[in-house]
Regions:
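Short active-site segment of divalent metal-dependent hydrolases/proteases
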Residues: 17-18, 46, 130, 166
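Short acidic, glycine-rich surface-loop motifs adjacent to enzyme active sites
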Residues: 13, 113-134
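Active-site glycine-centered loops adjacent to acidic/histidine catalytic or metal-binding residues
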Residues: 14-15, 43-44, 127, 162-163
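Residues at the starts of beta-strands that form the adenosine-phosphate
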Residues: 9, 37, 121
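Extended active-site neighborhood of metal-dependent phosphoesterases/phosphodiesterases
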Residues: 21-118, 138-158, 169-204
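N-terminal active-site segment of His-dependent metallophosphoesterases
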Residues: 1-25
């Protein structure tokens, strides 16, 4: 694949089977036939809504794919995937989660990045957008500002995000450094209702 210029790995950005954990095995079987390694990022729809705590709600995802926070290197890039969805329980989909990074997660990220050379490209993957969320008083963006501070220490940093179902680019300026946030459209496009687009965007 590499010699032909094709991707040698991929990464999802959450909401993989849309509240249907019984489909994990089908999804894994389908991805196993792609002949490339695929890393997973957890989204709000990957949490079990029958649970009442964040850790319990994410346990099923972790049993399928491993830790929600991890990192790896590819070439000159250091890639981090983190869970920035707090599942808090609730009666409606809009009230059962919030966005952000815990203090413990932020410390994990700080320690992880301390082993990365400052001239490296850092790619940070999560589910919920950072754009507009740099205030520590905003409970939907807790510690996102701290993440941006850490990313600003590197030569180049990009944030890869899902969640919103539409494409958007946002540029954060942090400590004099530009950090690019890429919000990616969903594979289902306009909820499977529009004309099929073979390259995957904008309509799935």
């Amino acid at each position: 694949f590499k010699a032909k210029g094709r991707a040698v790995y991929g990464i999802t950005l959450g909401d993989i089977v849309f509240d249907t954990p019984d489909l994990w095995s089908n999804m894994k079987e389908a991805m196993a036939n792609r002949n490339l390694t695929i890393f997973q990022t957890i989204g709000n729809h990957d949490h079990l809504k029958t649970e009442t705590s964040d850790d319990k709600a994410a346990a099923n995802f972790e049993s399928q794919f491993g830790p929600r926070n991890y990192s790896f290197n590819r070439g000159n890039a250091h890639i981090v995937s983190m869970d920035n969805v707090f599942y808090v329980g609730g009666s409606t989909p809009s009230s059962n989660y919030k966005g952000g990074i815990t203090d413990q997660q932020l410390e994990w990220l700080r320690q992880d990045l301390s082993h990365v050379a400052k001239d490296k490209l850092v790619i940070f993957c999560a589910h919920m957008p950072f754009r507009g969320g740099t205030s520590e008083t905003d409970e939907s963006h807790m510690n996102h500002a701290g993440v941006l501070d850490l990313l600003s220490e590197f030569a180049e940093a990009h944030i890869m995000i899902g969640h919103t179902h539409y494409q958007q680019k946002y540029i954060h300026t942090r400590n004099g450094k530009k950090i690019f946030e890429h919000i990616h459209g969903a594979a289902c496009g306009a909820w499977w209702t529009s004309t099929l687009c073979a390259d995957g965007t904008p309509n799935g």
